[in-house]
């Protein structure tokens, strides 16, 4: 099965990219939206996700890898969790404004379903965001 791509959101004041880098790996839990939780359940080991800072500095800042999928949320086993580790920081953050302005990203779930905290990213969207990070 091929690698799938995702986007996970975090408020940097609560848990930032730097926090993840310092920890090396973390349990991604506390998701209480059914669609987002189903996305967590669909993740497989080796899948990659964009790490998105929400609220302040809105933008994609890095790439993480799913290291342990299919875990129950320790606070409520009816919900899902995964373990993730940082892979790399983007050359530069890709802001939400840039994503919204890019016509090839008009259907990205980050824009269409703005409140969704865990979203699937299509291969073309993944590649385009990586291109934007290099410009």
PLM features: what roles do these ranges have?
Residues 50-51, 65:
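Hydrophobic beta-strand signal
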Residues 1-45, 135:
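Compositionally biased, charged N-terminal/linker segments
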Residues 4, 24, 45-47, 60-62, ...:
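A generic structural signal for short beta-strands and their flanking turns/coil linkers
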Residues 52-58:
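Short, charged beta-turn/beta-strand-edge "cap" motif at the junction between a beta-strand
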